[in-house]
From Swiss-Prot:
Active-site residues, record numbering mapped to chain: 120 (nucleophile), 145
Tissue expression notes: Expressed in the intestine.
Transit peptide boundaries: 1-25
Organism: Caenorhabditis elegans
Name this polypeptide is given: ATP-dependent Clp protease proteolytic subunit 1, mitochondrial
GO cellular component: endopeptidase Clp complex; mitochondrial matrix
Localization per record: Mitochondrion matrix
InterPro entries listed in its UniProt record: ClpP (IPR001907), ClpP/crotonase-like_dom_sf (IPR029045), ClpP/TepA (IPR023562), ClpP_His_AS (IPR033135), ClpP_Ser_AS (IPR018215)
Lineage: Eukaryota, Metazoa, Ecdysozoa, Nematoda, Chromadorea
Keywords: Hydrolase, Mitochondrion, Protease, Serine protease, Transit peptide
Amino acid sequence: MLRRLVTSSLSASRSMSASVQSRVGIPFVIDNEGKGERTYDIYSRLLRDRIVCLMTPVDDFIASALIAQLLFLQSESGKKPIHMYINSPGGSVTAGLAIYDTIQMISAPVSTWVIGQASSMGSLLLCAGEKGMRSALPNSRIMVHQPSGGAQGTCSDIVIRAEEITRLKRRLNEIYVHHTGMSYDEIEKTLDRDRFMSAHEALKFGLVDQIETHNGSMPSD
């Protein structure tokens, strides 16, 4: 049942890949197996090695595909680590929390890596990885801030929406507190406005546990 569900979700993911392939050119790889050669799109091939990628804004469609992949890998093994690579500007809070809850629910440890940027909900998913397995590449950028949103309609509707955003803000602050070890007051103050961080600043803040070094020489931060 789960395998059929994941297959359908991955098919949807492939449909999404096809729609952007004309713009970005998603590569295909040939895998030499014992029974012959098989062709995979690169993301499906990486999935075999328990690697998943969040390389877009966070929305419900991306969340559904990523959650399906996490559940599939959990069904394969609840002990082997899953590696999540993040390069995302953030996006929907509820979609991001759906991914977050899945990471926390499964028993397979999830290592997180930021390459490029992990902003907004992307930074929350970065710090949600298994403690000791959260990494940043040297030139990555991380940004945290409070949730934002708009409202229209009657005065009562606007008040209801504002109260919901306030509740989400409080919950996101609590999640950052849990994963960074910072105090609630420190988190609330930091997230009051956009706060951009280098990899080293994110390490000091508690969003990541280590910075992956380049094999070659590079300028210091």
